[in-house]
Amino acid sequence: MLIIPYKGVTPRIDKSAYIAESSSLIVDVEIGSNSSIWFNTVLRGDVESINIGNNTNVQDGSVIHASRFNGPVEQ
């Protein structure tokens, strides 16, 4: 998996979460317990934060990118 920190902010991943090797987690992203991020998924928390809660599944090829106009993404 690709983990990209920026300005001291690094994605946070619960130890029980599954992250597929081909996924990208960028800057302010948090993955909750027992959650899974599947193949070729991109979570871009470079503008606002992304919080994937506990027991959540983000499927193959998903792209989640928060906008500064709409606030953070929480699931």
Residues of each region from the PLM?
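A contiguous binding-surface segment within folded domains or other stable secondary-structure elements
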Residues: 66-75
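Extreme N-terminal tail/first-helix region
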Residues: 1-15
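A structural motif detector for beta-strand N-caps
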Residues: 11, 16-19, 23, 29, ...
